[in-house]
Amino acid sequence: MEKHIDILIVGAGISGIGIAAHLSKDAPQRQFEIIERRENIGGTWDLFRYPGIRSDSDMSTFGFNFKPWQSPNVLASGSSIKGYLSEVVDEYDLKKKIHFKHRVLAANYDTASKKWYVEIEDAAQKKQTWIANFIVGCTGYYNYDQGFEPDFPNKDAFKGQFIHPQHWPENLDYVGKKVVIIGSGATAITLVPAMSKGGAEHVTMLQRSPTYIASIPSIDFVYDKMRKVLPEDLAYKLTRARNIGVQRGIYTLSQKQPKLVRKFLLKSIEMQLKGKVDMKHFTPSYNPWDQRLCVVPDGDLFKILRSGQASVETDQIEKFTETGIQLKSGKHLDADIVVSATGLEIQILGGIKGTIDGQPLDTSKSMLYQGVMVSDVPNMAMIIGYINASWTLKVDVAADYICRLLNYMDKQGYDEVIPEGDQTELMEDTVMGSLTSGYIARAANVMPKQGKHAPWKVTNNYLADRKALKNARFDDGVLHFDKKTDTVERKTKPKLVS
């Protein structure tokens, strides 16, 4: 069975829903369909269902630019975010465009017809071929099937429950049980207070090394007051602009004055702990924003640690035992449940096998043009959100650019666009930037590479991107456009796997 479509959006998470909404309002002449492998929209916010799941960015910047987040809550629960996305789906009538329980297996671009031939497996596990003019990959950057798990010595000896947050058991009973959470990132610092409040006998956060953690208010009182005296849209725009500036300011200051920011963060944590917990557990060896800065609402993590309901250990695992974890220091952590909050397994485009005329593509040897399109790959965009700000900010600017590009192609009568790569621009760093987080280090052999200069340099700077993409010319000598009747030989060939 073959099906001809115009634009194929892969993924109905926050990126896919955002792209679809922008296309609906900014390029309404283009038709699109959305493929979603799961039964529901939401992506990350449908997959992760562990206790306390929430955003780690403020919702005024995590919400879309076209739809105000109408709540004073700074951070939001996973269910609230799914509800917000459902509203977008309803407002833009997207439900009829989404094909649930459909999975893209492979995609081959045929240069003769200038079409993508996409192999799809439907809910009945029957294979179909969809023929698309343009693809937008909105699958995020991690493997939905499994998270990253280190090789824990003797793990099989453990008689309790071993859980990864990515696959949280429904109705897990942890009341009255001893829980050890391995990790110190956003997931771990969310789980500790949530499981403690949920009735666990004791929760221990076991970390190999400390992480910077900032406490932020759970309610944005300024925004709440503005909403009462200003139109909702204006209050949202002002709050969004303020928070974008604050985010960027903290990140920039961390790069330029790391000692100053470190001193401030550590002093803030010390005030939260009130001498009840040793500061060695919250004093990282790296500088602020060398890894992503984690946040907690109203210092909930520190409150739980002060109360004694939870504790933190900075150590390394010697091995698992039948009853818990033996640490290299000699200490034993008793556990009924162990949660491995050890990060994500990086994966691009949902693991789709991509080819051009049957020849495999290698994204790790490619760059991103304007942070949106893969070098030497025709008629495809890929959404990778910011690592130092809200993911959705990138979705908005990328969607605006994609809509402008498609409108330009329609006006000029073009069927194909290819960002022609310049290998002299290729760097060793990936587009994830200079962060040293474990999951980013593991992305080196998967992620597209950073470029030295624009338009190949991914800035991870929303304000810079918004200006650059809004004003970007399409006749820049890098984008190569073709019509179906064109026979002009391209200057470069797609990057292939040898």
From Swiss-Prot:
NADP(+) binds at residues 54-56, 184-190, 208-209, 292-293. FAD binds at residues 15, 36, 56, 62, 104, 395. GO terms for molecular function: flavin adenine dinucleotide binding; N,N-dimethylaniline monooxygenase activity; NADP binding. It is found in: Cell membrane. It comes from the Bacteria. One of its GO terms (biological process) is alkane catabolic process. It is a single-pass membrane protein. Binds 1 FAD per subunit. Pfam families: FMO-like. Its EC number is 1.14.13.-. InterPro entries: FAD-binding_MO, FAD/NAD-bd_sf, Flavin_mOase-like. Its cofactor is FAD. Keywords: Cell membrane, FAD, Flavoprotein, Membrane, Monooxygenase, NADP, Oxidoreductase, Transmembrane, Transmembrane helix. The chain crosses the membrane at residues 4-24. Belongs to the FAD-binding monooxygenase family. PANTHER family: MONOOXYGENASE, PUTATIVE (AFU_ORTHOLOGUE AFUA_8G02570)-RELATED (PTHR43872:SF1). Is able to catalyze the degradation of n-alkanes with C chain lengths of 32 and 36. Probably allows Acinetobacter baylyi strain ADP1 to grow on the long-chain n-alkane dotriacontane (C32H66) as a sole carbon source. This is Probable FAD-binding monooxygenase AlmA. It comes from Acinetobacter baylyi (strain ATCC 33305 / BD413 / ADP1).
